UniProtKB/Swiss-Prot annotation:
GO terms for molecular function: lyase activity; nucleic acid binding; tRNA-intron endonuclease activity. It catalyses: pretRNA = a 3'-half-tRNA molecule with a 5'-OH end + a 5'-half-tRNA molecule with a 2',3'-cyclic phosphate end + an intron with a 2',3'-cyclic phosphate and a 5'-hydroxyl terminus. The gene is SEN2. This is tRNA-splicing endonuclease subunit SEN2. It comes from Eremothecium gossypii (strain ATCC 10895 / CBS 109.51 / FGSC 9923 / NRRL Y-1056). Belongs to the tRNA-intron endonuclease family. It is an enzyme of class 4 (lyase).
Length: 356
């Protein structure tokens, strides 16, 4: 119960827009009216600075910065941590695993632990640089790649043996492994912020076009997603996905990626910390046809996770020429508005369970 109450306080806002809280108004007090009007005129619920979006060459849309990632997660559960299951908690988990917090390791002071980690990190870097020079020299001499790999395995084994010797001499496990040396910051008390929050293309569009949250260019996002000259079927597919995403977000659902369960979206009533997703959404065109095996396969995967399969048929209400004209004119929100969503729930009928 305490965990749920703490989560309710943390995840108050379902979207990255915080409503303005106006002061109480006392009708018979003129100063109260003046203060209320002043607060109403001067207040704003817009972010002081938009969150920058990075568009990678591989088509990934990421947000960096711990505060920005936490803000998007706590205000609507947007994105997924690249090194986490959902919420970007890799940095906190790694700090806890390496015992880099202020409490430190039992029996050691924080300053001593920091100095020891810095010393081991520098030693590892020197060893690695020496081996890189040795490997380059072997390649220049024409040594086979298999022999170079064998030398590398031997070097790693020697490095591990030194760590074991250190553990045996001190009676305490080494605070830094070779694979952790590069992620520890120079101060030795934190790790490098290498985790990013990855957004779906429809999430990036929603936070750019529908909500003024991301500092991004919508044409750049679409060009990276569809290519410089997309065909009409590609445009329609993206429009259907965005229309479905916007439709469920506007109705208060928390929409997450459904790739884990072989569908397009997952629908949560509040979000992952509170309940499991109840519905899995598959976005389809009205004229899209599949055989029974396809529907049965999707339903079996979704049903195995105790979820209900929703077939969202997104229909275009205007001619294709009108959609193409709006798209080339970069009037994207008007193009998305040409689509409407119709849902159909797919359930397996079992004689033993559905008999009434």
């Amino acid at each position: 119960m305490a965990k749920r109450v703490a989560g309710s306080k943390r995840y108050v806002h379902p979207l990255p827009i915080e409503p303005v809280v106006l002061p109480p108004l006392i009708a018979h007090n003129p100063l109260s009216w003046v203060y209320w009007v002043l607060a109403y005129v001067t207040s704003s619920n817009q972010l002081p600075r938009k969150i920058p979006l990075e568009v990678g060459a591989d088509g990934r849309y990421t947000v960096t910065g711990r505060e920005q990632m936490q803000y998007l997660w706590e205000h609507g559960f947007f994105g997924t941590g690249q090194l986490s299951r959902s919420e970007p908690t890799w940095q906190a988990r790694t700090v806890d695993r390496l015992q880099l917090d202020t409490e430190g390791i039992a029996g050691h002071k924080l300053e001593q632990v920091t100095q020891l980690r810095r010393k081991q990190r520098l030693e590892f870097k020197r060893e690695r640089a020496s081996f890189e020079r040795k490997r380059l020299e072997l390649r220049r001499q024409g040594v086979l790649e298999s022999e170079i790999l064998e030398q590398e395995r031997l070097w790693l084994k020697q490095l591990r043996d030194r760590e074991l010797q250190w553990e045996a001499s001190t009676g305490d496990p080494s605070p830094v492994r070779a694979e952790d040396a590069e992620i520890i910051a120079e101060d030795g008390a934190s790790v490098l912020p290498i985790e990013k929050l990855e957004l779906m293309p429809v999430e990036a569009l929603f936070l750019t076009l529908a909500l003024p949250v991301l500092h991004a260019d919508a044409p750049a996002i679409l060009a990276r997603t569809l290519g410089p000259q997309p065909a009409l079927p590609q445009i329609e597919r993206l429009c259907r996905l965005y229309a479905a995403y916007h439709h469920y977000r506007s109705h208060g659902w928390c929409v997450r990626s459904g790739i884990k369960f072989g569908c397009d979206f997952l629908l949560y009533r509040r979000g992952p910390p509170f309940h499991h997703a109840e519905f899995s959404v598959m976005v389809l065109a009205p004229d899209e046809r599949h055989d029974y095996t396809w529907y049965s396969t999707v339903a079996r995967v979704v049903g195995g996770a105790q979820k209900t399969l929703v077939l969202a048929y997104v229909a275009r209400r205007a001619a294709a020429d009108q959609l193409a004209a709006l798209w080339h004119a970069r009037r994207y929100m008007e193009a998305f508005a040409l689509f409407e969503v119709h849902e159909l729930v797919y359930r397996r009928w079992l004689p033993g369970k559905n008999r009434e």
